[in-house]
Amino acid sequence: GYGARSRDVIKAIIATDKYDVKLLSQRWGATPFGFCENHPEFKNLLDLVVPMPLAQQPDIWAQITVPNEFQAVGRYNIGFTAGMETTLVDGTWVEGMNRLDINFVSSEHSKKSFLNSVYEKQDKQGNVLEQSIQITKPMEVLFEGANLEKYFAKKVNPNLQLNLSLDSIKESFAYLSVGHWMQGQI
């Protein structure tokens, strides 16, 4: 989810050793805090958390969340979002993406969904205005993949042939569902 993605992005930025990184903690729904305290490899991130309000405007502001929550706070503003598993996104998401200088999404499908989302802008009387709502800011795909060294068994049957190509799927339409079944009221 967004928490794991945030930690991955932060670790990668810190690893460049080019920036003075500061973090703001952001609540996500009813998700509990405490991940960093319970995972020693991330405990160092707690030292980077700064209190609100910010003492000064950041040079670079990066926000990792759903686009309707994007706010331009820094001199240069970057958005990271997974997007939506659909063909069109809501107009408020398009407007959120346009508030920032550049946005990163996690798949070509997500990027296409944003680019295909074009809406007529109307005034309060319902009159169509000349201006439309559509993505006007740069958007790039920041691929998130699986580490095959970690997620495939170390000992593979040499007679087993793994076909990792989606081109081999014979059906003209296929739906992939990935989820985690959990008990309610967690």
What function would you assign to each model-found segment?
Residues R5-R7, A15, D20, L148-I186:
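Conserved catalytic-core segment of nucleotide-activated headgroup transferases in glycan assembly
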Residues I13-I14, F114:
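Hydrophobic alpha-helical packing residues
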Residues Y19-P32:
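A short beta-strand-loop structural module common to alpha/beta enzyme folds
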Residues D20-V21, N77, M139:
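Hydrophobic anchor at the start of a short beta-strand
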Residues L24, F80, V141-L142:
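Hydrophobic residues at beta-strand termini and immediately following loops
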Residues A30-S113:
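Extended catalytic core of nucleotide-activated donor transferases of GT-like folds
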Residues D101-L162:
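Donor nucleotide-sugar binding/catalytic pocket of nucleotide-sugar-dependent glycosyltransferases
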